[in-house]
Amino acid sequence: MPPDGAVLAAGQRFDIRVEATSDTAEPPSKLTVTLSGKDITSQNILDPGTNGERGAGGTGTVDGALARLFWAGTAPPNTTNFLKRQVVLTTSGTIVIEARTADGATARVRLTVESWRALASARGGRPAKNIILLLGDGMGIAHRTAARLVSRGLTNGKANGRLAMDTLDATGMVMTASLNSAITDSSPGMSSYATGQKSNNNQEGVFPDNTANAFDNPRTEYIGEFLKRTRGAGFNVGIVTTADVTDSTPAANAVHTSDRTAGAGIADRFFEERATNGVTVLMGGGQRYFMPKEDRGERTDGRRLAPEFEQEGYTWIATRTDVQRLLAASPVPKKILGLFHQTHMAVAFDKVGAGKYSDELARPANEAYRDSPMLEDMAALALKSLSAHSPSGFYLMIEGASIDKRAHAADSERMIWDTIEFDRAVAVALAFARRTNSDQDPSNDTLVIVTADHESGGLGIIGVGNERYAPATLGKAVRDYAAVFRFTTPQELTLFPNYPLDDKGFPTDPDPSRKILLGWAGAPDHNENWVSNRIQQEQAIAQKGETTVSVANPARDGDGPDSDNKTVGGKPIPGFLVRGTIENGETACPDVTVCTADTPSVGHTISGHTASDVPLSASGPGAWQFVGVYENTDVFLKILRASTGNYRVGSDAGLTPGASARPVQPRK
């Protein structure tokens, strides 16, 4: 590692790891490693092993003998390994890493190092001082379209307005595969953007290795780490999410691990590596990993991490009221730790609809979360803090996490509401960028990117409700409610949604007579009654017998008396069974928080990701680079080029030198 074909930015730190495995109990001997013809075998940091050879027999490094960053766990005893940390290549071109053992076995990888800094003969682009990357987790084209149809509506076939994310200057399509799968999970999905490298599913900021330790894998430098190191103390990083802050997407901007579920360990590394990751603003859920069990947390080591952040100058906040207080404060704190939930934050449907069409926050277990901030408020606070304290610029990642999490539950309304909430955060970012990009100072410009890590659920917009078959009218759900274009006479129906809206674009009634109807191609068996659910429920549950399989959850849209199948007015609407297309999994989700995760090791009763390309929209310096179809890893270099003005200006700028512009080679 890195794998063959990897493209690195000139000056970007990365680790080299070589693993030689024997078919016998004895490890291979005399492993030699060369970098572009230069022997670097002596630079192996692993401890001496079999016959005194470093790395032979699976040796790691003695804990405490080297700085924690350079530590490595033990590997299988029939392996000989090489590890060199923090390699930096500054000259562009092709680099060859070759490994050989005494028996003549040879392996070779070719890497490309790409220049990204502005050339002496500048191309005319203005540099981006600040980068704001907004990621709607799992947000494919249909998710964006659904949010527009609901929050803007149609008149005479034309949209009554655009989403904020529809208004950016340039749009392209991103290919989302991970290093080991056509269908990525969120960890390598985000990590590919932030490092320029593919990772295995479940891993972020690292390449795979043969050790069990979750934090010793070979690393690649994140964009925030890179710019912090190269721009200095005046550059800062912000991470804002509606998920647990140790969840895949937020962690894949600052923490290097092969285990996306290592919650407490991930929280530790946010703190312990703050000098290099540059994170001064961290907001979302996940308080459980910052406090011990005896203090409403889940840590088993007794560590009280949140107070440690406070001791290092972070302002620790926990409510929407706290966010509003800091937004009004002058000066605003430079360092902010916002932990607004024990796990993932309350979703927009339940925050906006509390006491009206959602009962989720009325549940006693959720009493502490009734004063939860909206994502737009968190985004505004992050921008206020970072812009005030980052003379060398900042990198800010803002995630709408529960677009994905509610898509996993095939929870149409909650997914749409979270997409609308996310779009309101996009509007906050665009307003900030308009101010910096239109003033008289050419050195403070901002690049805004809106994209997704993958598509979630195989979502399709399958129709608009035909009023004559409305569930509230019939007292039951029928498939004929999903009107597409079946007409007896040309003027018989108007098939445009009719949601009443508040002043923020959220519906005041989630179940109008003509609502949009969604279908999920990547879902297990579930019931459907075309009516929103007042509480969050699993779509499928396990039924234990000789073999454990999952079935559609009768408590969600089923026909039982205890089913959450009622309209806002209280009328029960029994649903019909929708046969799923993916495996139903062997274990039930123990609670809704776990159910809406997408951990590969857990048997699913939830919808899955798909391999569909996802849209990316950009505005600001270098935005035109993002026109076209490209790998998720290409985004990293495009951002770096934008940061120095090293890009072509205008509509011809979509094709830039690099991996995305290379011709397709015939398959051998």
Regions found by a protein language model. Name each.
Residues 1-12:
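Short, compositionally biased P/S/T/A/G/V-rich stretches that sit at domain boundaries
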Residues 16-24:
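Aromatic/hydrophobic beta-strand junction motif of beta-rich domains
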Residues 61-92, 111-114:
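Short, hydrophobic beta-strand segments
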Residues 92-102:
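Short, aromatic- and glycine-rich surface loops/edge beta-strands on solvent-exposed regions
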Residues 102-108:
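Short acidic/polar inter-strand loop motif in beta-rich domains
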Residues 113-131, 227:
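Low-complexity, Pro/Ser/Thr- and charge-rich linker/hinge segments at domain boundaries
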